[in-house]
Amino acid sequence: MEELKGYLEKSRSKQQHFLYPLLFQEYIFVLAHDHGLNVNGSIFYEPAEISGYDKKFSSLLVKRLITRMYQQNYLINSVNDSNQNRFVGHNKNFDSQMISEGFAVIVEIPFSLRLVSSLEEKKEIQKSQNLRSIHSIFPFFEDKLSHLICVLDILIPYPVHLEILVQILQCWIQDVPSLHLLRFFFHEYNNWSNLITPKKSNYYGFSKENPRLFLFLYNSYVVECESIFVFLRKQSSYLRSTSSGTFLERTHFHEKIEQHLVVLCCNDFQKTLWLFKDPFMHYVRYQGKSILASKGTRFLMKKWKSYFVNFWQCHFHFWSQSCRIHINQFPNFSLHFLGYLSSVPINPSAVKSQMLENSFLIDTVTKKFETLVPIISMIGSLSKAKFCNVSGNPISKPVWADLSDSDIIDRFGRICRNLSHYYSGSSKKQSLYRIKYILRLSCARTLARKHKSTVRAFLQRLGSEFLEEFFTEEEKVLSLILPRISYPLHKLYRERIWYLDIIRINDLVNHL
């Protein structure tokens, strides 16, 4: 990082802001290799079909690549050769992937340095901001949503044209060659005329090919989408909210730099600010879904909906479907967010009061925030993973039948404990018990299939030890959190428990 600071200070003294030359530095590719975000393993492991060696990390490949990039028209020639050396294509050329991941490191540098400088100015680093659990959102819901009326359920639209993403980065990165190289990546990857379209194949393919660059671009786009909230909070005395300094995505070290966002939005939204003065506005986002809750009327939320649509159309120059924003009103609404089905039902109750010889009934209404396991969606996810059929009946998983008995039980038990861990905050545990039952019986069917036996005979042979694999670890965790609980643990399962160490959603939950 110190070397990067020195380079940028030298560049700044010459009135230049060039990041492109960093692509010719070997340590940039080392940083990309150490990042470890590539789901298929690092690209810096030389493929056996290219070198004839086993998959080993080789700095020699990086040096050869840098030497070739110094050659004139290397990139142009690599694109014209469509057989083996295509820069970006279906064959996943080794050199192109190396350059792509190195470029992802380069474009992150200005944001990382800006974050470090901002933390140095504050003279304090709040590590809890980066380690905050996903579950911390639900106590916030419980405290706020029960007092609110309307909710906007928003699916953040995708940018239709790739040039939008380039223009967003252009506000922060003044290096024109780097922006041209970014355009080059987009246009040459599967002939992308659109980066993100209703067809999921291109979007999904690019995210798998280079997750680091993809997440960086997506985060930049989301920051731009959320810039309106920063502006309203800064400019309006009626919108009082505390800034938590939240990082964009937990796998990246970027921060929303609010003062820059205000500059971007100041000219666009000042005239319409008076429409949305609301002291009870709360906004929460995770990935591509966000909610905006308010104590205002349905008419106010219609204004917000219209404003969002116009904002996306005017600021990002693409047509946004209004159906991506739903106006809902408590208590006749259930919110799907972070794998939970949340609602605020009204619970009527009657209290009998007696004063001297007179007695009377007092009807009261209370609101309680409830979080439920979306059992239908979960069964769909379990069905996709081949643990049950679409009706929720457990089936064997033949793919795991070749594993040892301990490995099979360990895999099923780990999934069961992870889901129990994540859904520990559920108000009603019946759906969670059903999921455990599906996984437990699917495990028994898989073991019975392996040993060519019946499920009944196999369960009789295993006895209670089979069940302990699914619950022992969970009981240990609960006993550490609530050591003074004296009543049985089966009563403890009725309580809602929010954990502070969950930083990502389980893969099965992510299918929802």
From Swiss-Prot:
Task: Supply the InterPro entries for this chain.
Answer: Domain_X (IPR024937), Maturase_MatK (IPR002866), Maturase_MatK_N (IPR024942)
Q: Which domain of life is it from?
A: Eukaryota
One cellular-component annotation, GO: chloroplast
Its GO biological process annotations read: mRNA processing; RNA splicing; tRNA processing
- Disulphides: none
Q: Which GO terms describe its molecular function?
A: RNA binding
Pfam families membership: Intron_maturas2 (PF01348), MatK_N (PF01824)
Q: Which UniProt keywords apply?
A: Chloroplast, mRNA processing, Plastid, RNA-binding, tRNA processing
- Where does this one sit in the cell? Plastid, Chloroplast
Q: Which family does it belong to?
A: Belongs to the intron maturase 2 family. MatK subfamily.
Q: What does this protein do?
A: Usually encoded in the trnK tRNA gene intron. Probably assists in splicing its own and other chloroplast group II introns.
Q: Could you tell me what this protein is called? A: Maturase K
Source species, please? Filarum manserichense
